[in-house]
């Protein structure tokens, strides 16, 4: 027997409509810029990736930091996680005007630090604009994505070595080039950038829908439980005799 038919019917209705909308969410009802059909989750993921890329362009600011260390030379030996990449890494560094010698499982590198970072930022700028051809040209024919990844790897290995050499400022600049320059460009390559200012109504609508949809399910379960006589009530405080 139902404890409250009205609450139970309301809960079932909410749960059915919740399920119908869930099915619609997983249907390819949306289309992206390239004409590809997307379901609701893919559409929102695509949108927020574009917005993330649009808010991750820091290259002009980082370039100013690199300018401050122009002429600063370094001489370190780094170990690479994959020693097989050492020859190609040495080629990339040579393009930047850095001396690189393959040594055991790593590289002995020296030169003007700003030149290496300038190449990393120039290539990252090309990738951020989805210009793989331009990035590849900077690496003299080596795939632009590969070249940037090699720079990121060797620069990551350099940070601790620079810190050991008391080149704290330089190590900080290298870290920022990797995190704010290379990583966004590499990770968001192929994704168009969107300005959130142009998408405020859509973003607000998606967030409002998310909150409403979550509450929708919660109320459905609550009303169904209430309808069958299962509800949460505050227990009475027992009075001592």
Residue positions per predicted region:
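Generic structural hydrophobic/aromatic packing signal, biased to beta-strands
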Residues: 16-22, 76, 100, 109, ...
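Juxtamembrane interface at the cytosolic side of transmembrane helices
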Residues: 2-11, 197-241
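Hydrophobic secretory-pathway targeting helix
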Residues: 1-40, 207
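A glycine-rich, hydrophobic loop/mini-helix early in the fold
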Residues: 55-65
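Long, solvent-exposed extracytoplasmic domains/loops
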Residues: 63-173
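Short, aromatic-rich amphipathic segments at membrane interfaces
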Residues: 174-209
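Alpha-helical transmembrane signal-anchor/signal-peptide segments
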Residues: 28-57, 194-197
């Amino acid at each position: 027997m139902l404890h409250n038919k009205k609450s139970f019917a309301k809960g079932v209705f909410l749960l059915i409509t919740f399920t119908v909308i869930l099915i619609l969410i997983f249907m390819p009802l949306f289309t992206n810029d390239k004409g590809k059909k997307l379901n609701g989750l893919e559409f929102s993921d695509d949108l927020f990736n574009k917005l993330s890329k649009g808010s991750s362009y820091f290259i002009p600011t980082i370039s100013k930091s690199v300018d401050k260390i122009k002429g600063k030379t370094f001489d370190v030996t780094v170990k690479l996680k994959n020693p097989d990449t050492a020859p190609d890494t040495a080629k990339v560094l040579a393009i930047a005007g850095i001396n690189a010698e393959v040594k055991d499982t790593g590289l002995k590198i020296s030169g003007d630090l700003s030149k290496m970072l300038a190449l990393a930022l120039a290539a990252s700028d090309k990738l951020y604009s989805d210009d793989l051809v331009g990035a590849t040209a900077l690496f003299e024919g080596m795939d632009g994505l590969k070249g940037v990844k090699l720079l990121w790897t060797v620069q990551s290995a350099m940070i601790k070595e620079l810190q050991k050499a008391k080149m704290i400022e330089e190590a900080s600049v290298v870290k920022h080039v990797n995190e704010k320059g290379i990583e966004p460009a590499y990770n968001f390559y192929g994704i168009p950038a969107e300005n959130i200012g142009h998408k405020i109504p859509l973003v607000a609508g998606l967030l409002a829908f998310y909150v409403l949809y979550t509450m929708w399910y919660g109320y459905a379960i609550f009303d169904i439980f209430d309808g069958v006589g299962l509800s949460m009530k505050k227990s009475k405080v027992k009075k001592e005799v």
